[in-house]
């Protein structure tokens, strides 16, 4: 794309505020182009399931330069040895399912992932777009009993159950989150009494 100094200006101003010497150095080269983002904000690495011996390294979500060395090493090892050198499921291309063939769902979820890219990443944070997508017949019953759901591969499943008087929603933080006490009680019941999974 053409250089876009107007778009870049706010970032340059913030950089100069932190490193004043940048004001006199100027911009020598601008690279302005498209970037690829994925529905879960993670890379896509590994062997394409539909095409033997085709290895993929894509969807770096604006971290391609920073992650290129490690991703290149992992792919090289995978190609040479026939298996990944470590557990890469979070970025493995095989993590995608038939759900990811739904263009509207992918678009909505990828826009949400892009929107979260430069925000605070809280532990256990769930995506909200495209939900609920797939739910068991017990979904409504469990929700009525205070279930707070998360989503895995499109399937809604209860993460925890809100107690009486507690709002049935996640409140994210870097410390103990609002589900900590409720999950502790569920754990204690499982350990000392009977629970059904």
Residue ranges and their predicted role:
Residues 86, 93-197:
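Glycine/proline-enriched, intrinsically flexible loops and inter-domain linkers
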